[in-house]
């Protein structure tokens, strides 16, 4: 150890004074960590040095214990002005890599020992040329990366390793060290050899960079993301002798500052955002599908999570896909009726706008807000598009359906559409019930068929006849779509700026701007213009939050990338099949409306044809049945254009003539046939951007036809979708109300063969229900509107006389009730056969009965009567209003969890006032009374026919209550209701009005066999069934008595 003292004596006095000064400061608690004094940094570092390869702070390692135990001076046995370092590995450097003054003993091949003099020397000479990388250190780093253990895991592992006595020095790196102060080579080597023989240093956890987390450790996701990103920074070279990386040549000791974890992570994220924004990306390797199954690509998953965090934190929308259009899917919870209902979002549904229905909603919002509690929340009016071969083909199909409407076989017959390429496609109308699908309304420069056949050559080998047979299978027909640029009047400004540079500009093609410019007589043209806009704006003024929520939900940006926990393997497989890289789904080029309008391109019809072709060919090749294929095809549409905007000018849909000679596989009829009165000319479709050949007219949509037959599904409901559904609706209205020359709301664009029409967007009343139960009741003694033709008047009057409508003011149009494990359904034709008295009362009771106990009836009846009383008073105050053809929709959840407060509320029956297509407001009657074909006889009074129906419902509900409770008064309070039911349970029974004992917890035999009875026996007074239930027939065979007032059916 004498050699060590000699080395110590050769250190200059100035250096020794500096060391004493440092020891004095450390004893005072000023220095608690190992840091480079050359760096002008005053902040204290954390106790843990973060960063991969220890590169965040000069690659200098320090002891976790902060060297706090040896502050009394330099140990005489150590005798050197050195500090601890770690991970000194076998040197493979050339003699030029290490200065001559330093040669490491061969004893240092132990990775856990180190030379303290060497670290001190490197600190003073860190600007020397880089030393050759150490292969052993790099190999060990790779092993650590594979292990992916956190810094805490490494510390725990090292704590279990054998520990030996560690004589530690308290000296820190000095600020300025002169090379001349270092001892000669031979003397220094001998001292180093002596130290390494006598002392074995313990492992130091902070000398190791923090590697990736292990697969089983999910608590360090943010560190994992940061460490993945460090690879993108230019790495510094690694010192082969000490494992210390030298700094880049651009390093300046006076300006360098240590990056903390947060700042480093933020800078790395920003750098990755900038890297990904570059369009020229290196081609990514897509592994084979089998290899993906065996070993998931965890790196891609980490990068995916990184992208999600960046999009949230940085607000980067460059890789988000803003859909320009959405497809409408059939709504399956519909109860009866001809009107097709489609799902727009999870919260909203839409249907064809008929006559003045939107004006009714907007008028009630302005003038009678107290009635809104009974109405579904109105959102607005949508412009909806559908492609068709031509106007002549559309009317031809309409005539064929109209001529064969009494033939039940024609209702399920597929309608053939002959395309210009002679490829006939039969469209099946079975609803799919699939979730909402986002599409891009971008035209293609090339035929979509050619693109698909190029990607999948095997499709070309399929014979056209096979394609036709495949298309006539269970594939649904092409559905209508809502294009964003057609509906500026309803899009919130916060969303519109994503698509346009001038969101505040007035849209020429919107409902709002065109509604005030129509030429024909409308209800509001005689009044104030501002009032008209308020009453006919096409957008709600009350439910703005719901409107914005629905629009954002539908047109929200979609990121086409693999999810962390789903479809990772599937994504790779389909990318391999399609011959594309994963980056293909995240790149997008948009086109400005100006460029699109000046370019000759295919119209939206090709996009529709492409979707149909993909749908049909998915039967040909099972591998094509995947949503990722559809995404890639849609991505091709958007990638076909260049530009900075995603908004397409509507002019481009007329300017292109290529659709007439390009291959097109599927252009089907729109189920969007909105019927609007002739006074509503041009509200939606009329705009400078449209070339319209529309003819004026009205469709008075009605729920009833003269045909007494209907095709039923398993539950008795027939659900149409697609082309046949809307053709049936049109054929009915054309035959009963209006002729072809009256068609006004359907706008044909001859160049693109697009049908543009109006849909009304409403709240989905079944959204929070698990098993929705509904009873559709047609209210009033008059169902035809003020513009109905003579034939329509006569047919509707005869129908009222034959059913319960004339005597009761209400008739049943549909029933759907959950019975423990299945639905009981009845259609409107069944409702027409229901008689006044016990039959009507039995259907009403069966709707409220849950199939388990009579208690369900007892609880529901008071709630329902209370709502009917409130509704009666509100309708009574609507002087001058007429609710012709309106309905009451009674709804509740048949499978609600009573323990949950929200679900329990859904189990309560709710009265909804719907169907205002033929309703007339007071303003309508005042402004256009002389234009009505059949105006109200007493326009200044309330609708007495509707009020009669409300009173009839209350009459039969009260009749059922009195029988079950022995004429007890109605109980509206929930606490009192619970007390009454508890008292009944204690007495085990309740004596009814007939003297029989009724147990509220028991079933009602009269209702239990409702769905099992034969209707012929049901209507035969001498049948065994009628004799069996004779007592109930006598009890409920009652009818409310009304004066035969002529005003009741005005």
Swiss-Prot record:
Keyword Nucleotide-binding: yes
Biased composition (Polar residues): 156-173, 566-624
One cellular component (GO) term of this entry: nucleus
InterPro entries membership: IPK (IPR005522), IPK_sf (IPR038286)
Swiss-Prot/TrEMBL keywords: ATP-binding, Cytoplasm, Kinase, Nucleotide-binding, Phosphoprotein, Transferase
Disruption phenotype: Resistance to wortmannin.
An example molecular function term from Gene Ontology annotations: inositol hexakisphosphate 5-kinase activity
Chain sites annotated for binding substrate: 772-780
Acidic residues composition bias: residue spans: 307-316
Ranges annotated as biased composition (Basic and acidic residues): 290-306, 402-417
EC number: 2.7.4.21
Its job: Converts inositol hexakisphosphate (InsP6) to diphosphoinositol pentakisphosphate (InsP7/PP-InsP5). Involved in phosphate regulation and polyphosphate accumulation. Required for resistance to salt stress, cell wall integrity, vacuole morphogenesis, and telomere maintenance.
Family to which the UniProt record says this protein belongs: Belongs to the inositol phosphokinase (IPK) family.
Note: Present with 1940 molecules/cell in log phase SD medium.
Stored PANTHER family: INOSITOL POLYPHOSPHATE KINASE, KINASE
Protein name listed in UniProt: Inositol hexakisphosphate kinase 1
Organism, scientific name: Saccharomyces cerevisiae (strain ATCC 204508 / S288c)
